[in-house]
Amino acid sequence: MKKLMACSALTLSMVASSLAFSADTPAATTIRTLSGAQPTQSLSANATALLVIDYQNEYFIGKMPIPDGVKALKNTQRLVSFAHQHKMPVFFVRHLGPANGPLFAEGSKFADFHPDLQPSGSDRVITKATPSSFVGTDLDRQLKQAGIKQLVISGLMTHMCVSSTARDAVPLGYTVIIPEDATATRDLATWDNQIVDHAVLQRAALAGVADVFAEIKTTDQVLALPVN
């Protein structure tokens, strides 16, 4: 009986210690928050640009279909209209692979922009060959020449080209907003023959880039921002 009581007391003590430790553990936060970053309250029409990344047929009728691609495309259409309305520059980014390559083959229909999201005459087109929209392109030069300080980044895929572009943008001096529902990704195979669901990967990718590099909003929240 004494042994049972001693065991119970030890168990209760361990539980109490665990609860005390949990209470003392800081709530999860981001490096941006710890660094004092504040939510964006408005957009400057002269200093903000919209990047529209890789809305190409490969992700819709090709080898890498994106489950939520159409939803993201429709929200990006709204962002493009918003940018045009406020005379913000819009940059359409496309990925091109070798003409005989397996993905985004140059000259193929899979490398073409989706028919429902095409650049207009006033939009600029950037062609890249890596996940980042900055590597091997003159995007940074064009943005700086236009006086751009802030980027709204939409596109495919969230964990790859959207994230890579955001991560490269910040060291170049830009602030970044990612409208989360204007981006999307696909199910991903892992090294141990498992599958990471696209919704799980989407959330993890956004959380990863939001820690340091980007402010995450919805499309509705971006469209509701005052423009000056």
Name each model feature, range by range.
Residues 21-49, 77-81, 86, 98, ...:
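Active-site-adjacent betaalpha module
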